Every structure is written in structure tokens, then in C-alpha cells.
């Protein structure tokens, strides 16, 4: 069974993620590596990518401390991964796209010119994400009903997103999502925004994932919407509001 309690074998890990992500896990936690669990896979995939992205910007001493130097015997490959594993998982989840073509449709629209041919490592990651979603995410997917206050916030978010100009950046979208969340019960009085106003608590972003996607958490919502498409996100909110009406 693929339940949480059972460890994975190395072969199973490699059904869901690259050998490099497994090497990173082993490198970081040599003692823990005797027990592999599925829920640490996404973080290790994305952390590996971050270490790789950062490598060329580091000086010699920092490079020696970077796990990718050890994983690749001092010769890490060039990094170019336009999306994260966590984002791919959320795309599969939101679109129920259990095929690579649909996912590549989103990626190609978001980053024109990026194809399975130009980015074979990303193509492999798309396959891993579909396997991971099928075995670990889909079986536990549960949409929760929004409260009345959350419904009102979702309606406002839907309206604000539909006003955005085409081609809005992930940053622009994230700002809109943040602005709409700046209300009770999501205000965070401790974490102030740049302008000194109350910040927005994680509960707001978690609610979006729980209600819209049936999962506990996800990547930055603005980044997700930028790849998924604003119109698709608006339809997704409409679906959630209709489901809970």
C-alpha cells in the first residue's frame, strides 16, 4: 500500500523523482536515508533545483559547500527549470491533467519556446509529477466547503482576477491575491506588510488550496495562476462557488 506509514524503496522513489533528488536526500540525511518517505520527495526535488540554480552565482568556497558539487563530483550541469515540482503537481491537480500533453500546453503558453525537446529534464519531471499525483495526491484529495466569509473573499478574488490584463506576471497576480486576502479573518497583525498595514496570514493561502484544489497547501498562488492561466483560475473559483452553493 502507498499509505503514509510505509517507507519507499529506492526503485519506488525513482518512479516519482530524479536520481539527483534522491542523492540530495541521502547527502543531507545520511542516517535518515534508511527510511524513504513519499512526502519528502517534492521538497528534495525543488531544493536540488535551487541548489543547482544558485551554484553559478556562488564563489569557490560556497560552491564546495553546495550539495550539487558533491552529487555531480564537482561538475554540476547547467540549470534551466522554468517551473518547480510543487507547481507541476498543483497543475496536474487543478486540471486533472493526467497526461503530459496537457501539462506541456500550460508550460508552453507560460514560457514560449520551452518544449520536451529543449528541456528533456523538465519532460522527465512532468512524468514524475503525474506518477506522484496519481499515487499520493489524488487518493487523499478532499475539497472543503468555504465559510460564508471565505465565499465572499473568493467572489472578490474571482472578480479581481478577471480584471487583470492578459499576460500579467506572477508577481502582479500574487499582489492581487494578497490584497484580497487583507481582511478578517485573514489579517496578521504581527506580520506587517511593506506599507505598515497588517499582513495576510497563511490561512488565506491554505484556504485557497483546500477549497479550490482539495489539497492542504501548494506553491505561491500567483506563480500557479500565471502558469495555469488567469481565465482557468477564474473558472476554477466559479466551480468551487457552484459546488458549495
Map each language-model feature to its residues.
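Basic, alpha-helical terminal appendages of large translation-related enzymes
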Residues: 104-245
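Catalytic adenosine-cofactor/nucleotide-binding cores of aminoacyl-tRNA synthetases and other
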Residues: 1-131, 213-245
